[in-house]
From Swiss-Prot, chain B:
This is Dolichyl pyrophosphate Man9GlcNAc2 alpha-1,3-glucosyltransferase. It is an enzyme of class 2 (transferase). Its main location: endoplasmic reticulum. Disulfide bonds: none annotated. One of its GO terms (biological process) is dolichol-linked oligosaccharide biosynthetic process. Glycans are attached at residue 59. InterPro entries: Glyco_trans_ALG6/ALG8. The keyword DNA damage does not apply. The lineage of its organism: Eukaryota, Metazoa, Chordata, Craniata, Vertebrata. The gene is ALG6. Dolichyl pyrophosphate Man9GlcNAc2 alpha-1,3-glucosyltransferase that operates in the biosynthetic pathway of dolichol-linked oligosaccharides, the glycan precursors employed in protein asparagine (N)-glycosylation. The assembly of dolichol-linked oligosaccharides begins on the cytosolic side of the endoplasmic reticulum membrane and finishes in its lumen. The sequential addition of sugars to dolichol pyrophosphate produces dolichol-linked oligosaccharides containing fourteen sugars, including two GlcNAcs, nine mannoses and three glucoses.
Length: 536, 507
């Protein structure tokens, strides 16, 4: 349905989008339980989270939004998102008023499911619009005759059929579609040199979901460097004279106004500390229940391996080891046994240090929108690698903007293929019931086959996108999946070590994502020197 | 992009749609005491696994034929037996004799859905892909888009993966038959078609075109030489494949007779429920079932069916061509559907699949027909709670067809293969200039009508005086469409020869 309206609205680009298989059509399907008897597809806790927020914002006054705690899923998104839920709740009451009762925990009537699922599909319209705007920014130098080989078409499919976004939003249940829509739209506006609009959109986005603060450095520096400085020196450094106070005031004004609109009421009520404490829950532990495939997953895995080895050769005293770390393996509060335990401050410092080079790059040799996008992806990836309590879904923050780069340069396309394949694979544990197994495998194959073959045909004349090592690494995801989902549950270890499949998935994917991150970093940094040499 | 990756994407897309539809409801879910086709299939597994073959088709103390007795040919029974074997390995409760009646659970549903999915993947989908690859004089893109449209055809998906049946098996075998015939592997083709026939007796709808085409081919080769040899070979193949399928039942004539009685239950009446065929639609005006005796009904329907089949079959026998064969498959199946005895609403699938085969030749008409055929099953789908899958798959199918064939630009007489017909009429009728526009607006009108009726039957309560208002109007409107299509297909078949001769002259 979304696809239909996109096709109708797009006029000139109509054919292109129409050939894109409509996501809406399929997105609607997995959640069709017309009969309570056959409510088949599971919905995650996030479904209940959002139902609860609908109820909270609908029934309570503003002053209690961030205090209400009947459900364990308290409101922990910024105020704009709460307002969004408030608006939705006024439509929801026409579907099933019972879902708006705060005490109705885990309430799932067919009408509730229909409404919630449909609200995600409907808000996806913004995402589709943003994709269209992004496609306009991609320069069509390679104007292929065949529509299937046009970069804009490929980009549209890569974004709209993004496996991660599809399963996280439409099966697992979240509202990432329109949030990423806002982000892509702001990127598109920056590419079109409509800086103020882009800044406004991003500021609004930040107050919808604060996870986007990870990429804020890229926005800040880019706006400062390319918008506030109106001219550059010949060697690419900023011309200090050209600094425009008017422009920075405008930017500041936008940010302040948006923040005032969002946080103002809570400041007046004196609830800012409470809001902040809800938004940044540092009590939650280094890793999420399932380790996101980042640096800390590798760190924890090494720690675990060392513990096992230590116990075997009697280097460690078994009585001193915290029990949880050996049995559960994936508990929330994770104590490392051999390696030093990690504090939130340490992760913050690591994140900061890892972001720094990319930001410097953006400042010292701005390459226009391309450089900005590279910096954006690097920021997202770095914070994914080193952040505190990172969710596996956060990888989408890097994958989606990287799609824009992948259709413009072969080198980025190679990195994109590694990152998406491993990143999407790491989302597999999100869907764990048997009926969802075929869906996730089919959708993943669909996206992977498309991304590989389309990018390969786009860069037909250049050298292969992946070298042999990368190819072998990616191919081995197949046996890994077969082992984790089919072989392992049949073995007797299933009961004793239930965490092994998750551990394997997370560690294996962490290697790939780490590699993609390093490769992208190296390519960005080395590009600088070569560009500088050329300039000299 | 390369052909194989496009085809892979098409297949994956088709599989995804199939699986997502299968997550929905099925026929008779949670509706004791009879449940629906889902329970029928499960019951057959139970019966075939637990009883000796001799008792499968007989009413015994362990096999109550009134409760979903087996009424399909042996291959269906073997298939059930095979599935039951797997079921036994997973959970013996699913097929326990007597106690498993009406068994429903999430894991059982998953199992049943998987059996359909696997059957579809192994038989129907490869046939479609190979068929599309074998299309001559078409670009890669056209081949892929034909495959996409055929695989996304909502009717078959909704009935097999939603309502719950194994039509893709018999239709898949029939497709393999067509495929083999198009490569001139006549023996293999007829063997494949025999398998289809032994899976579902409804495949008889397709048997005449197969017969006429092969017979015509024998005639063409000369009945005294090669033709006779081919005829003997074909007859041998058919007899042999039937014998293999029926081997366990050949012990006793009574066995065979009982199976046949089960397969052709002539006492069940002219039609059931609300079928979009001529008898059901006529009974809105005249209650045929009450006016005419059952024996006369049988004779009447037979006579009308036979008469409507005759012209195209004769034509095919006299001038056997692959194109004519496909078209005759359509028109014969449609005649059977409209006029024959004891037709189900699902039998329209037997017409739809041949129509799928000509989707790249007459995309506009094929799309239109496929939409109508899905719409004609709406009352059934509503009963099963498949409204949402129906709406979404239909819209997806329509947009896939519009995008890949640009159907709205292909409405001229030439695109509809009506050129010879219009030439023969020239002089009498002068409105042919307006023809494309008229056809297009008819299509839009019909699509709007179908949309409105779909929405109304889903959302509006019928007036108390006419509780069946919507099902009846759905079936009558579909029936009118089908009559129109029957005329259309007959016209293009019968006027085909001039066209091909002209083409030959040109070349």
């Amino acid at each position: 349905m979304c696809g239909l309206s996109a096709g109708a609205r797009n006029g000139g680009r109509r054919l292109e989008l129409e050939l894109v298989p409509r996501p809406g059509a399929r997105r609607l399907l997995p959640q069709v339980p017309p009969h309570p008897h056959v409510t088949f597809c599971s919905h995650s806790t996030d479904f209940e989270v959002h139902r609860n927020w609908l109820a909270i914002t609908h029934n309570l006054p503003l002053s209690q939004w961030y205090y209400e705690a009947t459900s364990e899923w308290t409101l922990d998104y910024p105020p704009f998102f709460a307002w969004f839920e408030y608006a939705l709740s006024h439509i929801a009451k026409y579907f099933d008023p019972k879902m708006l009762v705060i005490e109705n925990l885990n309430y799932t009537s067919p009408a509730t499911i229909f409404f919630q699922r449909f609200s995600v599909i409907f808000t996806d319209l913004l995402f589709i619009y943003a994709v269209r705007e992004c496609c306009r920014c991609v320069n069509g130098k390679r104007a292929a005759k065949d529509i299937l080989e046009k970069p804009t078409f490929i980009l549209a499919v890569l974004l709209m059929w993004n496996f991660g976004l599809l399963i996280v939003d439409h099966i697992h249940f979240q509202y990432n579609g329109f949030l990423f829509g806002l982000m892509l739209l702001s990127v598109a506006r920056l590419c079109q040199k409509r800086y103020l609009e882009g800044a406004l959109l991003f500021a609004v986005l930040l107050h919808f979901k604060h996870i986007y603060v990870y990429v804020a450095p890229a926005y800040g520096i880019y706006l400062l460097r390319s918008y506030c400085f109106t001219a550059s020196n010949a060697d690419g450094s900023a011309k200090w004279r050209s600094f425009s106070f008017l422009r920075i005031t405008l930017l500041g004004l936008i940010v302040c106004l948006v923040s005032a609109l969002s946080l103002g009421p809570f400041i007046v009520l004196g609830q800012l500390p409470q809001v902040i404490s809800r938004l940044f829950p540092f009590k939650r532990g280094l890793c999420h229940a399932y380790w996101a495939p980042n640096f800390w997953a590798l760190y924890s895995a090494v720690d675990k391996a060392l513990t096992v080895i230590g116990l075997k050769y009697n280097f460690l005293d078994p009585t001193k080891i915290p029990k949880a770390s050996m049995t559960g393996g994936l508990v929330q509060e994770f104590q490392h046994t051999v390696l030093p335990s990690v504090t939130p401050l340490a992760t913050l410092i690591c994140t900061f240090i890892s972001i720094l080079p990319s930001v410097f790059c953006l400042w010292f040799k701005p390459q226009g929108p391309r450089g900005f996008l590279q910096c954006l992806v690097l920021c997202a990836l770095s914070s994914f690698m080193f952040g505190w309590h990172v969710h596996e879904k956060a990888i989408l923050l890097a994958i989606l903007p990287l799609s824009l780069l992948s259709v413009q340069r072969a080198k980025d396309a190679g990195i994109y293929l590694i990152l998406t394949t491993t990143g999407h694979f790491s989302l597999f544990p999100l869907l764990f019931t048997a009926p969802e197994l075929p869906i996730k495998i089919l959708l993943m194959l669909l996206f992977s086959v498309y991304s590989f073959s389309s990018l390969k045909s786009l860069y037909r004349r250049e050298k292969p996108l992946l070298n042999w090592l990368e190819t072998i690494y990616l191919i081995h995801l197949v046996p890994l999946e077969i082992f984790c989902e089919i072989v392992f549950p049949l073995t007797p270890w299933k009961l004793r070590f239930p965490f092994v499949p998750l551990l394997l998935t997370s560690v294996y994917c962490a290697v790939g994502i780490m590699y993609a991150w390093l490769k992208l970093y190296i390519s960005v940094l080395s590009e600088r020197t070569s560009a500088r040499q050329k300039a000299e | 992009m390369e052909k194989w990756s496009l085809m892979t994407i098409t297949v994956l897309l088709a599989l995804t749609v199939r699986w997502t539809v299968s997550l929905g409801s099925y026929s008779g879910a949670g509706k004791p005491p009879m449940y629906g086709d889902y329970e029928a299939q499960r019951h057959w597994q139970e019966v075939t696994y637990n009883l000796p073959i001799r008792q499968w088709y007989f009413n015994t103390s362990d096999n109550n034929l009134l409760y979903w007795g087996l009424d399909y040919p042996p291959l269906t029974a073997y298939h059930s037996f095979l599935c039951a074997y797997v079921a036994k390995l997973i959970n013996p409760d699913w097929i326990a004799l007597h106690t498993s009646r009406g068994y429903e659970s999430q894991s059982h549903k998953l199992f049943m859905r998987t059996t359909v999915f696997v059957a579809d993947l192994l038989i129907y989908i490869p046939a479609v892909i190979l068929y599309c690859c074998s299309l001559k004089e078409t670009s890669t893109k056209k081949k892929v888009s034909s495959a996409l449209c055929i695989l996304l055809y909502p009717g078959l998906i909704l009935i097999d993966h939603g309502h719950f049946q194994y039509n893709s098996v018999s239709l898949g075998f029939a497709l393999w038959g067509v495929l083999c015939l198009s490569y001139d592997w006549d023996l293999l083709g007829s063997a494949a078609f025999c398998l289809a026939l032994n899976y579902k007796q409804m495949e008889l709808y397709h048997s005449l075109p197969f017969f006429c085409y092969l017979l015509g081919k024998c005639f063409k080769k000369g009945l005294k030489g090669k033709g006779l040899l081919l005829l003997i070979k074909l007859a041998g193949t058919v007899v042999a494949s039937f014998a293999v399928c029926w081997l366990p039942f050949c012990t006793d004539v009574e066995q065979i007779m009982q199976v046949l009685r089960r397969l052709f239950p002539i006492d069940r009446g002219l039609f059931e429920d609300k079928v979009a065929n001529i008898w059901c639609s006529l009974s809105v005006l005249i209650k045929i079932k009450n006016v005419v005796s059952p024996q006369t009904q049988l004779k009447l329907s037979f006579a009308v069916t036979f008469l409507s089949l005759l012209p195209t079959c004769i034509k095919l026998t006299v001038q056997p061509s692959l194109r004519g064969f496909k078209l005759t498959l359509v028109s014969c199946a449609l005649s059977f559907f409209l006029f024959s005895f004891q037709v189900h609403e699902k039998s329209i699938l037997l017409v739809s699949v041949p129509v799928c085969l000509i989707i790249n030749e007459v995309p506009f008409m094929a799309t239109w027909f496929l939409l109508v055929s899905t719409f004609s099953m709406l009352p059934l789908l509503l009963k099963d709670g498949l409204l949402l899958p129906y709406a979404v798959t239909t819209l997806a199918f329509l947009s896939a067809c519009v995008a890949s064939f640009a159907i709205f630009e292909k409405t001229s007489a030439k695109d509809l293969q009506l050129k010879p017909f219009s030439q023969s009429l020239r002089g009498y009728v002068s409105w042919f200039k307006l023809f494309p526009k008229i056809v297009r607006s008819l299509f839009l009108l019909s699509v709007t009508l179908m949309g409105v009726l779909s929405v109304m039957s889903a959302a509006v309560h019928p007036p108390q005086r006419f509780p069946d208002l919507f099902p009846v109007s759905v079936s009558s409107i579909s029936c009118l469409h089908f009559l129109f299509f029957l005329v259309y297909f007959n016209v293009i078949i019968l006027w085909d020869s001039k066209n091909s001769r002209n083409q030959k002259k040109v070349s």
